[in-house]
């Protein structure tokens, strides 16, 4: 019988204080059946991204947090608690390192062998750092991406446009709602029926189609009426994409969010019955990976053909181009990644995916923060529109939460305002504030966040380490450094932070420091790379950068 984990609700503590209760509840929330993709295996999202190495380690982490003092710090090594040290009251309560390998050993083969020996785990980004909030966690970023694409190519609106994509897992599941929020029509190919049904249950997806003909009828009707609609097609992208090319059905926009970063535990090859594919993963992994590579090559060839015939095509951060390139598709990088194509200007302003979670479990606490945004940021029409749409259309998974993109200065201001509401009792329990590792200054990923940097610094990995170090010094409640998130082992290093608003003076000081230094590293990283918008932001915000003026 599989274990079911759910974070406690309310104000009763199970630890010695909220500084310990917060990470404990968020670890548990990552494994809530409403949140995690495979909670019985400790897998949260992203193929095999886990919250803890095994159930024994999970129990030991919980016990350690329950016993942790206010001047101690717990160390977690790839999902396993390995030490508790006396530090001080304003230090982080938890420091996490996940999936890190010495560079020459940093590939999937080495990683899987070490994982098999029980020595490591794959933490993805927010799985092993205990700040995953379900599909909403990537929703605004996806909304912003499709919105930026609409601005660039279609005068700011996807009305009457046919968007093709694939993958409805924890990350890809945000795509259908993000497209319809931008008024488009989207066909999402997904091989797993349960994932399609899950997205419908949580109102991220409108309809399911059993075959391509049925799906295209729905697409054509919605496009002709310029009516937003999302359709989940049960099928394999490596079969459906080439079939659409063969039929001459060229979408307006094409991307993909299958788990191509992991050709064993993520991607599913074409022409295999889904249950059999899952068996083959374990029975003959080498054969499975060979089939995955072949399917990815066909998948990307079809995307290139769509581009050749006039579609807007972009990589959505799953490293599918790299996998295809390795398999001999030499033009795989002819279509761009989403960050250089659409998102980098926001990074230059210190903007990124800012999220917060109500530890009380009461949705009213999140609704109060929604009103706070509308009250205090009323001059930001784009942000207010997002908050209103999220309030109307986003279903909570696990502990109630919200996400929006805020920039340098805005994050610290909002953090203080939330802390004030907790202090006044207008919010019932502390609010946890964190972000995705996909942020302006916290990641080095040459095929994704740092692709095509102006100065050629795509692979420079000092920046996420500096981000983690300054946020530790600034007093984030927990800080994490990971390897391989999003694009797979060997292709990225990245850092995460979480800081809590518990209404105290201590929290106010931490929030001011952390929510300034964290986006600040994004500004300095982009100034250093020569981006004029980042220089303008640094000048306006008074960011201290020694060798630049």
UniProtKB/Swiss-Prot annotation:
SUPFAM superfamilies tied to this protein: Urocanase
Molecular function GO labels: urocanate hydratase activity
Entry annotated with the keyword Transmembrane helix: no
A GO cellular component annotation in the UniProt record: cytoplasm
Compartments it resides in: Cytoplasm
Chief localization: cytoplasm
Residues binding NAD(+): 46-47, 124, 170-172, 190, 195, 236-237, 257-261, 267-268, 316, 486
Top EC class, one word: lyase
Positions of transmembrane segments: none
Cofactor: NAD(+)
Signal peptide, first to last residue: none
Protein keywords: Cytoplasm, Histidine metabolism, Lyase, NAD
Segments forming a coiled coil: none
Superkingdom of origin: Bacteria
PROSITE patterns: UROCANASE
Similarity remark: Belongs to the urocanase family.
Protein name, per record: Urocanate hydratase
Species of provenance: Natranaerobius thermophilus (strain ATCC BAA-1301 / DSM 18059 / JW/NM-WN-LF)
């Amino acid at each position: 019988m599989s274990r079911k984990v759910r974070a406690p609700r309310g104000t009763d503590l199970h630890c010695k204080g909220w500084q310990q209760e917060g990470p404990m509840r968020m670890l548990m929330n990552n494994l809530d059946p409403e949140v995690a993709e495979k909670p019985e295996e400790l897998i949260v999202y992203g193929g095999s991204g886990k919250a803890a190495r095994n159930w024994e380690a999970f129990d030991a982490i919980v016990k350690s947090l329950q016993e942790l003092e206010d001047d101690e710090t717990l160390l977690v090594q790839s999902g396993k608690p390995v030490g508790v040290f006396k530090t001080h009251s304003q230090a982080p309560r938890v420091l996490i390192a996940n999936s890190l390998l010495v560079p020459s050993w940093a590939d999937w083969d080495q990683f899987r062998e070490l994982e098999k020996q029980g020595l490591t785990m794959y933490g993805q980004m927010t799985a092993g750092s205990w700040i995953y909030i379900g599909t909403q966690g990537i929703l605004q970023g996806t909304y912003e991406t499709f919105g930026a694409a609409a601005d660039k190519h279609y005068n700011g609106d996807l009305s009457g446009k046919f968007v093709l994509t694939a993958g409805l897992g924890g990350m890809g599941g945000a795509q259908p709602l993000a497209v319809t929020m931008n008024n488009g029509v989207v066909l999402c190919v997904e091989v797993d029926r349960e994932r399609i049904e899950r997205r419908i249950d949580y109102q991220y997806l409108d309809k399911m189609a059993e075959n391509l003909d049925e799906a295209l009828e729905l697409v054509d009707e919605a496009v002709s009426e310029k009516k937003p609609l999302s359709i989940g097609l049960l099928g394999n992208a490596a079969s459906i994409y080439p079939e659409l090319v063969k039929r001459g059905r060229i979408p307006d926009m094409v991307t993909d969010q299958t788990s191509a970063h992991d050709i064993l535990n993520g991607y599913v090859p074409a022409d295999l019955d889904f249950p059999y594919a899952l068996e083959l993963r374990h029975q003959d992994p080498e054969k499975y990976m060979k089939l995955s590579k072949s399917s990815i090559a066909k998948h990307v060839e079809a995307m290139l053909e769509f581009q050749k015939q006039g579609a807007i095509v972009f990589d959505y951060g799953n490293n599918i181009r790299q996998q295809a390139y390795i398999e001999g598709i030499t033009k795989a990088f002819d279509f761009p990644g989403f960050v250089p194509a659409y998102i980098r200007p926001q990074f230059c302003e210190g903007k990124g995916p800012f999220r917060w979670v109500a530890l009380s479990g009461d949705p009213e606490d999140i609704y109060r923060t929604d009103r706070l945004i509308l009250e205090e940021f009323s001059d930001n029409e784009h942000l207010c529109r997002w908050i209103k749409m999220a309030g109307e259309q986003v279903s909570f998974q696990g502990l109630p939460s919200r996400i929006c993109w805020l920039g340098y200065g805005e994050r610290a201001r909002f953090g203080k305002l939330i802390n004030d509401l907790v202090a006044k009792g207008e919010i019932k329990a502390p609010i946890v504030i964190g972000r995705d590792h996909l942020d302006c200054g916290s990641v080095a990923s040459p095929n994704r966040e740092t692709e095509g940097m102006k100065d050629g610094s795509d692979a420079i990995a000092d920046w996420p380490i500096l981000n983690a170090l300054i946020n530790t010094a600034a007093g984030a409640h927990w800080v994490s450094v990971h390897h391989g998130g999003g694009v797979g082992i060997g292709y990225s290093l990245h850092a995460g932070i979480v800081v809590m608003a518990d209404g105290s003076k201590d929290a106010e000081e931490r929030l001011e420091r952390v929510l300034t230094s964290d986006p600040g590293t994004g500004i300095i990283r982009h100034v250093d790379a020569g981006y004029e918008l980042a220089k303008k932001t640094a000048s306006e915000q008074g960011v201290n950068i020694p060798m630049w003026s």
